[in-house]
Amino acid sequence: MALRLDGKQLAAQLEVRLQQQIQKGIAAAGRSPGLAVLRIGDDPASAVYVRNKEKACARIGVESFGSHLPADASQQEVLTAIRELNADDRVDGILLQLPLPEGLDETPLLAEIDPNKDADGLHTLNLGRLLKGEQGPRSCTPAGVMVMLRDQGIDPAGKRAVVVGRSILVGQPMALMLQAANATVTVAHSRTQHLESITRQAEILVVAAGRPEMIGADHITPGCVVVDVGIHRRPEGGLCGDVCAEELEPVAAALSPVPGGVGPMTVTMLLVNTVLAWCRRHQVALELSDLVV
């Protein structure tokens, strides 16, 4: 039976650490860290995600600044809102909640965020820093995966890693982080032919393709570490990921569950990025080096 990569439990442990470290740093900084989440429109799923992030902030002592614009907000109105948050000294991290309503172009909006306040690690400058191996905010989901692997003593160095999916949100930064950890990395995607022959080479397999249960037992070699980034609602109810957990549990060495795997760690790494930005701004030295990816 596969080792359970329990992101929910790890996230809870890390929240306690973050809370303790924030309390140590408040005297030097003069205030708590601040995270601003900018939400456009009334997408129900986005509203739930934002509430979860606000609750996580409250648990660890990060001040949360919610900002909400209507679905018909113009590109210029969103740019103005971002610029106001850039100038707000209370704010250390800014997150633009995706996806955006139709008619808005996310690329220039993400580029408008102050790179030093980029809580999601998606600014072009920070993606470039990742590519060059320089310090900076990291994309939250792949960073969460790396911390999960580290927590279980799973070292990617020298291993064959396969990432299924090439999005700028997960797949591409995931591949770069694994490569930086000295894995030999292959990226597969929707145009990849003979996917099984590629995924079966993996000692570490990260699936972020956005297709429900697309990876089954035939796709892996026994003993593979499998990280499932996908999350989907089944027509009959309940949630599933991009892998068929029932098939993989008997053959994988380790497997992240859905829900309770990568999702909670994504939120935690958003908090980590915000707290680290707060530390840099106020020259606060905290014991968080093991959370830097």
Curated annotation (Swiss-Prot):
GO terms for biological process: L-histidine biosynthetic process; methionine biosynthetic process; purine nucleotide biosynthetic process; tetrahydrofolate interconversion. GO terms for molecular function: methenyltetrahydrofolate cyclohydrolase activity; methylenetetrahydrofolate dehydrogenase (NADP+) activity. The keyword Oxidoreductase applies. It comes from the Bacteria. InterPro entries: Aminoacid_DH-like_N_sf (IPR046346), NAD(P)-bd_dom_sf (IPR036291), THF_DH/CycHdrlase (IPR000672), THF_DH/CycHdrlase_cat_dom (IPR020630), THF_DH/CycHdrlase_CS (IPR020867), THF_DH/CycHdrlase_NAD-bd_dom (IPR020631). NADP(+) binds at residues 165-167, 190, 231. Keywords: Amino-acid biosynthesis, Histidine biosynthesis, Hydrolase, Methionine biosynthesis, Multifunctional enzyme, NADP, One-carbon metabolism, Oxidoreductase, Purine biosynthesis. Its EC number is 1.5.1.5, 3.5.4.9. GO terms for cellular component: cytosol. Belongs to the tetrahydrofolate dehydrogenase/cyclohydrolase family. This is Bifunctional protein FolD. It comes from Synechococcus sp. (strain CC9311).
